[in-house]
Amino acid sequence: MSPRRIAVVGASAAGLAAAEALRRFGWTGTLTLVGDEPHPPYDRPPLSKQLLQGAWEPGKLHLRAADQLDALGLDLRLGTRAAALDTATRTLTLAGGERLACDGVIVATGVAARTLPEAAGLDGVHTLRTLEDALALKARLSGTGRRLVVVGNGVLGCEAAAVARELGHEVTLVGREPLPMARTVGAEIGELLAAEHRARGVRLRTAAVGGFEADGDGPVRHVTAVRLADGTRLPADTVLVAIGSEPAVGWLRGDPALDTTDGLRCDAYCAAAPGVYAAGDVARWQHPVHGRELRVEHRMNATEQGMAAARNLLAELAETLPDGGNGALAPAAGRERRPFTPVPYFWSDQYALKIQAYGVLTGADRTAATVVDREARKAVALYGHGGQATGVLAIGLPPRQVRGLRALIATPAPWDEACEGVRAAVA
């Protein structure tokens, strides 16, 4: 009989959390962790903050020390890309052609940065998703060129613009939305963020990008400007394209049993097919509390969902493996599956601003923002959908006060009750 195996595809925060939880919950069989990057699991949020600032060296990003990874007894496949998954036979095919027979698979491949086709092959145009991306951008910003154009005014673009401005660069932040992060946080909070960026010297432009200008006609052409759709020319030594991401599901599209529209579609238990679960940025699952499908690209969710997927997979295997796992499944693993019902949390640091949010902000049909202290950049915003509060965001408030707002979202509370709760919390 072949050895029992679970494969976790994706070696970032969600994949690591899943691997650790599988061992903690009783899996003693082979545990394969596949990652397409050559690095051991590392933390991504500091790429646009501490690493870009120069405050951290790359080694500080590692999520676990080497001896901690060794203790997990992993079949570690770094620098290895998954090529296909056959859910009917639970066979994972790697890019080199190796085929792994699995009892279970957890997909945690995350997302890839979106790019602009007009920027292909241009030196000085960057994205920011991987460690290599961050190091390349950091090196570029350490050079003589001081003019940075950031294309995309979402969370990542705003964070990178803030860091570059603090490093002394001339920064122009370009976005289709009229205000920074407006698609996520709404107009009133967006106005507050816009005021902070302007006060720090960032130039804000609302426009689509029409193309790029570059010098030379050889194999290496250096970007010199960004052209906006209205014809405006923005001189640039460096360009960061931060226009969102695409779920890394291309390798799964050959299996008709999987729905890969906007991530890997899962049920409330994070299951995409029998024995196949998903976690992190790539997972689109049915949230029982919010009553709709969510795909959450937040660091905390990656860890929580990785653990949930591991627990639910082992609960399924405890019931379905014909031989009880042949010793690969400890008795403690035979627990019931549980729906994944997190209260999503994210944070963003921009200059001295600490932005924290609980719940779901996008898709809101109503918003109530309270500016507690405009001069001190302190504010709270409540987001609702269908008569209930679904999300809350705070800027500049003490952590304990922000955590107190979480209870309004966890249930979630009726809209009027939540509004009263916010007013009481900031009074």
Regions found by a protein language model. Give the residues of each.
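C-terminal catalytic lobe of FAD-dependent flavoproteins
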Residues: 5, 230-258, 351-427
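Residue-level detector of alpha-helix initiation sites
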Residues: 12-16, 38, 111-113, 132, ...
